[in-house]
Amino acid sequence: MDKKEHIAIFTTASLPWLTGTAVNPLFRAAYLAKSGERDVTLVIPWLSLKDQRLVYPNNITFASPSEHEKYICQWLEERVGFTSGFSIQFYPGKFSRDKRSILAVGDISEIIPDKVADIAVLEEPEHLTWYHHGKRWKTKFRLVIGIIHTNYLEYVKREKNGVMQAFLLKYLNNWVVSIYCHKVIRLSAATQDYTGSIICNVHGVNPKFLEIGKKKREQQQKGEHAFTKGAYFIGKMIWSKGYKELLQLLKDHEKELSALEVDLFGSGEDSDEVQKAAEKLELAVRVHPARDHADALFHDYKLFLNPSTTDVVCTTTAEALAMGKIVVCANHPSNDFFKQFPNCWTYDDDDGFVKLTLKALAEQPAQPTDAQRHDLSWEAATKRFLKAADLDKPLERKLSRTTSNFLAASLNLQEKVDEASAYVHHVASGFEVSRRIFGAIPDSLQPDEELRKELGLTDASTK
């Protein structure tokens, strides 16, 4: 009997922080493990109590990794409806205030023992390897797959000296990803390009949204008014997440859109400014605190307006389509996957936005087919992932006779180049001074005593 594949999924965030790299890898782990054909381990950051208070909402904290794991499993099972068959491991992490993200501490590849190391999935591989100092990922794992979630270049461009920073970051990202990943999957063309990468949306939606959409379709089939509310937008309330573009569009076209009423839902650093900008409009634009998108409050809205172009693949757009709503969004690479759905309407300019918004207010959403609904599911996303990663067929371990000598020589040369490049990165990431120059958290080369104690780490614990 063949040994089961073991897939270790490493990611950069964890619940209760409801960010994409906390939620999507969690669902990926659950659905990869669901069939029982493979062993799956989700490896997530553990934060000290001080950092938990900075990151997690509603004053939620955990005294131990086991308590944190229990919370995650309960949250997941409430949404997928089945008991998850994967395991959870924690790596030491620290929260970077200036980057607003969690960075790994020490060599996190050690969390997976060498004897079971097989396939690694790095969710945000650039983020996970910027400061990696330890065993080379490609050496430890038979196959390393990087999934690109975020366009860091766009975020960096908004900072001081952003153009120069983005230029340097582009080459740093290309360098570390090529060193540490065999395959690279980009969620959309809205990310940085990587040599040999493929574009594939390997994310699905929370099953709750598909259930909501199913009920709405049943109402439509009975001739009932399934959607009794107008337009809304939901997202973290910062200008760069679509609020700037949306409020500008509404301001510039108040006369044409005089019949439009819009509800905005979100919380964030720019909440007060968004509120003030909305109050200046003649249109009825109401601002509300953040709510769960699956809340019954949203079920009856007919139109989701989303002009954001900073996302790689917008989760809320997928959720709105799953609920059977019309989505009016920008004609942008981040929305390419959604164009296949009849309720996704894309615009190229202001006139297109106005025309489609008025059209949506006057019409009812199309009833999605079962196949279209399935394409939004995590079952379909998991199949796309397995195919994109070449995990849907047995690994070819032997080269053909006609090409083996040539390919072996080429691969050997490439391996030597990679090893030399990885050695340079290993040396540079091993000095505190060079680490700080490139933005690492001070004293993050090894976990401190507090993190080691909380995680029960010893020098031999992961060998």
Swiss-Prot record:
Going by the record, the broad EC class of this enzyme is transferase
What is the organism lineage in this UniProt record? Eukaryota, Viridiplantae, Streptophyta, Embryophyta, Tracheophyta
**What SUPFAM superfamilies is this protein classified in?**
UDP-Glycosyltransferase/glycogen phosphorylase
Q: Which keywords does this Swiss-Prot/TrEMBL entry list?
A: Chloroplast, Glycosyltransferase, Membrane, Nodulation, Plastid, Plastid outer membrane, Signal, Transferase
What family does the entry list? Belongs to the glycosyltransferase group 1 family. Glycosyltransferase 4 subfamily.
What is this protein for, i.e. what is its function?
Involved in the synthesis of diacylglycerol galactolipids that are specifically found in thylakoid and in nodule peribacteroid membranes. Specific for alpha-glycosidic linkages.
Q: What is its main location?
A: plastid
InterPro entries membership: DGDG1/2 (IPR044525), Glyco_trans_1 (IPR001296)
Places the protein is found:
Plastid, Chloroplast outer membrane; Plastid outer membrane
Q: Which GO terms describe its biological process?
A: galactolipid biosynthetic process; nodulation
Write the Enzyme Commission number(s) for this entry.
2.4.1.241
**GO CC annotations on file:** chloroplast outer membrane
State the protein's name: Digalactosyldiacylglycerol synthase 2, chloroplastic
